[in-house]
C-alpha cells in the first residue's frame, strides 16, 4: 500500500507566560527563559492507504493536537508531516462560523476547499439531506446544539470525498440514528481504502472500526501498531487507571503534565 501520511519527529510546543510582562520580555530578550509546554513531543508514524488509525489516550494526552496537525489547522514547532491527498477534518466545531447560517457555512467551507460555486450548488442538496437539519440549515450556527454542529460538519466533510479523513470525537454527540448513518458512511470510506484517523474514547467503536492504534500519553507516542497488538495494552492501562481514586487519577495526570514542562 502507498504511504498517505508520513509524520517524522513531530513536536508542538507552547511558551507559557504568567502575565503580559513575561510575554514582552520574551519578545525583546532572545535568550529569556520561560516555561515551555510540549503538547506533542517527537512523534513519528506512517499511515498507508486503507489504514484506519485509532488515536487513543486519556483526556489531555495530545490526541486532538495531533489530529489538528494532520488536518493542517495547527503548524508544528519542529518535525515534518507529509500528506499525499486531500484531507478533511470532522470535529464538532471545525471550520464552522457561528455568525453564518448552515447553508452559508457549507458554501464558505467548500470555497475554502477549492470547490467552484457550480460544484457547490450541485452538492448542496446532498449535504443538506445528509445533515437532517431541516429548516435549521437556514439558521445561524451559533444557535445550533453541539450535536447539530457535528451533523453539519460531518455532512460537509463526508460529501467532498477526501483521500484522508480525520474524525475527532465527532460521533460522541448527536442521536444514535445519525451516528449509525455516519458509521455506515465511514465504512464505505474504509472499503474504498481511504486513510482514516479516528479520535475516540469509545473503545467498542475503536475495536470494531480501526486497523491500527496510536496510543498517545503525555504528548508522546507510547505505542503504535496493529490493533490486536496495541489495544489490549491500552485497555489494560485503562482498567488500572479507572480503579484509581479520583485523587490518584489527578496525581497521575499531574505527573504527566509536569514532565511536559521544560524551562528553556
Curated annotation (Swiss-Prot):
GO terms for molecular function: ABC-type teichoic acid transporter activity; ATP binding; ATP hydrolysis activity. SUPFAM superfamilies: P-loop containing nucleoside triphosphate hydrolases (SSF52540). It comes from the Bacteria. This is Teichoic acids export ATP-binding protein TagH. Belongs to the ABC transporter superfamily. Teichoic acids exporter (TC 3.A.1.104.1) family. InterPro entries: AAA+_ATPase, ABC_transporter-like_ATP-bd, ABC_transporter-like_CS, ABC_transpr_TagH-like, Bact_Polysacc_Export_ATP-bd, P-loop_NTPase. PANTHER family: TEICHOIC ACIDS EXPORT ATP-BINDING PROTEIN TAGH. Residues 24-243 form the ABC transporter domain. It is a peripheral membrane protein.
